[in-house]
Amino acid sequence: MNIAVYSDKFSGTLSASEVIEIVKETFQNNSIKASYFPVTDGGEDSSTIFKEHGIEVQETINVKDLVGIEKQIELLNISGDIFVESSLLIGINNTNVDTTDLNTACLSEIIEFSDVIGLGGSRTNDGGFGLLSKMGLDFFAGKEIIDPKPCNFEKITSVEINDKFEKLNKKILVDTFIPLVGKRSAIEVFGPQKGLDKESINNISLNIERITDLISSNFKEKPDATKKGTGAAGGLAFALSEILGCNLVSGAEYFFDKSGLESKINSFDVSILCEGKFDKSSLEGKVMGQILNKNKGISYFLGGVYDYEDREIFKDIFECGEAGLVEPKKELISATKKLVNQITI
């Protein structure tokens, strides 16, 4: 029986490599052989995971993140493409500052260095307006230019293009197919994990729709915030693709191709998918959902929390539960031992 173990990070608790080491040790203690693959869709920790698949660092640059803290950012050379992970600067774990007081402006400092930008795992919910404010769009409150943070959205009365504006030619890796606005919008789906309550979600969503209309008045071809994938990284994908002209690409599919995993996924009888939380959004562009779609063998879920109504998509489900947030290693070992009992029957 050929077994594959795939792991993304367990955000806030365990890295993909830490998960794999725990599972590997438990399997080896029970004489179970398997192949192990850290995986990513271009979001949080994607640089680390790409490197574990042999991708090399091209150079390191110093850039200030969304709260002004200087970070060392690795630029990876992926088949000649220079890749940068956006969550290194705007990541959900970078700061506890209220997300309504944050935006994506800092990313303007890495644009010129990159060919491919990975989105996902962001702390921001600004529709990418912060980045646009540094790339040739001015946001006005009356006659005064204003910083387009969500806390200022209601004040924005007009948007104008200035001489700095130009289109870009870059690949943007998205970790979700969810749109910025419309049914199941990015702010609605991912806002709660970034600290937004229902009132804030509603206010930000309405203002994003209003401001995208203001932006649209500057273009003959109207930007579309309902397009698939535009919701990635709090709408940063919308700004990069619909305004700046970049190409959205599935981060998972890009990873499968560049890591060589594409040709291996269906060579296993059993696949074990490890993720911190599996829910409906996991099937809307996340790497685990993409593996599940491709895999023709038996699949098991091993992870933190399973929060999806259909449990039949896996042969069985092994969760750490809420206790996994407090003692992640201990609970993952316990869940893995239960999985071992299942696959050795």
What do these predicted ranges mean?
Residues 2-119, 123-345:
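N-terminal loops that bind phosphate or other acidic moieties
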